[in-house]
UniProtKB/Swiss-Prot annotation:
The lineage of its organism: Bacteria, Pseudomonadati, Pseudomonadota, Gammaproteobacteria, Pasteurellales. Xanthine binds at residues 92, 135. Homotetramer. This is Xanthine-guanine phosphoribosyltransferase. It comes from Actinobacillus succinogenes (strain ATCC 55618 / DSM 22257 / CCUG 43843 / 130Z). It catalyses: GMP + diphosphate = guanine + 5-phospho-alpha-D-ribose 1-diphosphate; XMP + diphosphate = xanthine + 5-phospho-alpha-D-ribose 1-diphosphate; IMP + diphosphate = hypoxanthine + 5-phospho-alpha-D-ribose 1-diphosphate.
């Protein structure tokens, strides 16, 4: 990745709220499925803004800070997705998105950010990001990158 795009908490909340507005009326949704870990943050905002208390997770590992690796499904919410919003922070290459589409074919799949390779795989997103740009999300940052406590 040649460029970095740094996202602040304020930016992230603003974009997530914009996504929530596009998902109205809230009464059409049974719940939210957050793609762990990046989708947990927008899921919290969507849950609050739409008044949805039923939040599930699908745990798919594909990244280790700045490297994309093999896809592993660790946990999956048991539904075909009907009436659910599936949310992730980003769609990048589309590898995770393809797996999500197979798992939850009837869900509305949304992300905050989308890169060109993955954008056609989601139903909606807020911000376009160039394919060669790495996103530094606010939960990964202090004044610089902060490794998770478990890695120390």
């Amino acid at each position: 990745m040649s460029e970095k795009y740094v996202v602040t908490w304020d930016m992230f909340q603003m974009h997530s709220r914009k996504l929530a507005e596009r998902l109205l009326p809230a009464s059409q949704w049974k719940g939210i499925i957050a793609v762990s870990r990046g989708g947990l943050f927008p899921a919290a905002v969507l849950s609050r803004e739409l008044g949805i208390r039923h939040v599930e997770t699908v745990c798919i590992a594909s990244y280790d800070h700045d490297r994309q690796g093999e896809l592993r499904v660790i946990h999956a919410a048991e539904t075909d997705g009907e009436g659910f919003i599936v949310v992730d922070d980003l769609v990048d290459t589309g590898n995770t998105a393809k797996e999500i589409r197979n798992m939850y074919p009837k869900a509305k799949f949304v992300t905050v950010f989308a890169k060109p390779a993955g954008a056609p795989l989601v139903d909606d997103y807020v911000i376009d990001i160039p394919q060669d740009t790495w996103i530094e999300q606010p939960w990964d940052l202090g004044l610089g990158f902060v490794p998770p406590i478990a890695r120390k």
